C-alpha cells in the first residue's frame, strides 16, 4: 500500500492511501471511515479466523482500484491544532473534494465510487448535495463520482428520549474534554475531535442536516443524481436502524438507487464482521460492477 499526503484548501494535510497501483483506468473505490477510527478500519475483519483481510482487500480481489482515506484528525492525517477548530462540515466541504480530485488526477478520470461507513457516508452525500446546489445552469458538468455506497448511514430521524439524552451527553462531554474519548469508552480506536462529533450529533438531535450557513444538506439530497446504494445492518438497533437508512435512500434524487438490509449484521459489523463476506460484501461488489 502506498501513501500520499495532500493539502486541503485550508492547508490541512490529509493522508490518502492506495492499496495497489494500476495504470489501466479500472474503476476505483474510495473507502471513507466514520467517527472514532481511520483507514485501518477497512483492512481487517475482526470476527473470523484472520488472515483474509478486510473489505478493502475483498474489493481489490474483485478487480477494483481501492483507495483509503484518512479524514482530518484521523489516521495519518493532521490532528486538530486546538479544540473545536474543525467541524463535520470540514469533512464535507474540504476533505471530500480534495481526496476525490487527487484520485481523479492520478487515474486520468477513471470511474470512481465513494464507499463510506456511517458519518463517512454522510460526508460524501452532503458534498454531492452541496455540489448539486452550486452547479451552473444546464447542461451540468460531469459528476465527480460515478456511484455512492453508504454502510450504516442514518437520516436525521426523530430521536427518542434515551437517544436524545445520549446524543446531548456526547456533545457536552466532547466540548468539556475537547474531544470525545472513544478509546477510553472502547467504542473506537481513535478519539474524535469535539467540533466534528459535536456538529454531527447536533444534526441528529435537531432532526436535520443544516450547515452553519443555513444550507439544508438533507433537503439537498434531492439534487443528487449519482447512483446510490444504501446498506443497513439488520441487527443495528441503535446507531443506524434500517428505517433511518431508508430515510436517506428515499431523499436521494437518483433514478438508480436501492436499500439493502443485511440480516444479522450490526452497525460496525457491516465492515468488521466476517459474516459480511457471505452476503453484504458480495452484494456491494455486484452493485458496483453493474454501476461503474
Predicted features along the sequence, with ranges:
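N-terminal cap/lid segment of alpha/beta-hydrolase-fold proteins
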Residues: 1-21
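Short beta-to-alpha linker loops that shape the active-site pocket of alpha/beta-hydrolase fold enzymes
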Residues: 70-74, 154, 265
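Alpha/beta-hydrolase-fold enzymes
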Residues: 105, 109, 114-115, 119-209
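Short beta-strand/loop motif that positions the catalytic acidic residue
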Residues: 224, 230-232
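Conserved alpha/beta-hydrolase "acid-adjacent" motif
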Residues: 237-243
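Catalytic active-site module of serine/aspartate enzymes centered on a nucleophile-bearing elbow/loop
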Residues: 258-292
Amino acid at each position: 500500500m502506498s501513501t500520499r499526503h495532500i493539502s486541503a484548501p485550508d492547508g490541512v494535510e490529509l493522508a490518502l492511501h492506495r492499496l495497489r497501483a494500476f495504470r489501466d483506468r479500472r474503476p476505483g473505490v474510495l473507502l471513507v471511515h466514520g467517527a472514532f477510527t481511520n483507514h485501518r478500519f477497512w483492512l481487517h475483519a475482526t470476527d473470523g479466523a484472520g488472515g483474509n483481510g478486510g473489505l478493502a482487500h475483498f474489493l481489490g480481489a474483485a478487480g477494483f482500484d481501492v483507495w483509503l482515506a484518512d479524514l482530518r484528525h484521523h489516521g495519518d492525517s493532521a490532528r486538530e491544532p486546538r479544540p473545536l477548530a474543525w467541524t463535520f462540515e470540514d469533512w464535507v466541504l474540504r476533505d471530500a473534494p480534495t481526496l476525490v480530485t487527487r484520485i481523479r488526477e492520478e487515474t486520468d478520470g477513471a470511474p470512481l465510487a465513494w464507499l463510506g461507513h456511517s458519518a463517512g457516508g454522510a460526508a460524501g452525500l452532503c458534498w454531492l448535495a452541496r455540489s448539486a446546489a452550486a452547479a451552473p445552469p444546464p447542461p451540468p458538468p460531469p459528476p465527480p463520482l460515478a456511484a455512492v455506497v453508504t454502510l450504516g448511514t442514518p437520516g436525521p430521524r426523530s430521536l427518542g428520549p434515551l437517544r436524545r439524552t445520549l446524543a446531548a451527553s456526547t456533545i457536552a462531554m466532547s466540548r468539556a474534554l475537547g474531544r470525545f474519548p472513544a478509546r477510553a469508552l472502547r467504542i473506537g480506536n481513535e478519539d474524535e475531535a469535539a467540533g466534528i462529533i459535536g456538529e454531527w450529533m447536533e444534526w441528529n438531535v435537531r432532526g436535520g442536516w443544516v450547515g452553519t450557513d443555513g444550507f439544508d444538506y438533507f433537503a439537498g439530497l434531492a439534487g443528487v443524481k449519482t447512483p446510490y446504494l444504501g446498506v443497513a445492518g439488520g441487527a443495528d438497533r441503535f446507531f443506524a436502524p434500517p428505517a433511518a437508512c431508508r430515510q436517506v435512500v428515499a431523499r436521494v434524487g437518483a433514478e438508480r438507487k436501492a436499500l439493502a438490509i443485511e440480516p444479522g449484521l450490526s452497525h460496525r459489523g457491516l465492515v468488521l464482521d466476517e459474516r459480511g463476506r457471505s452476503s453484504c460484501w458480495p452484494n456491494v461488489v455486484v452493485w458496483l460492477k453493474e454501476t461503474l
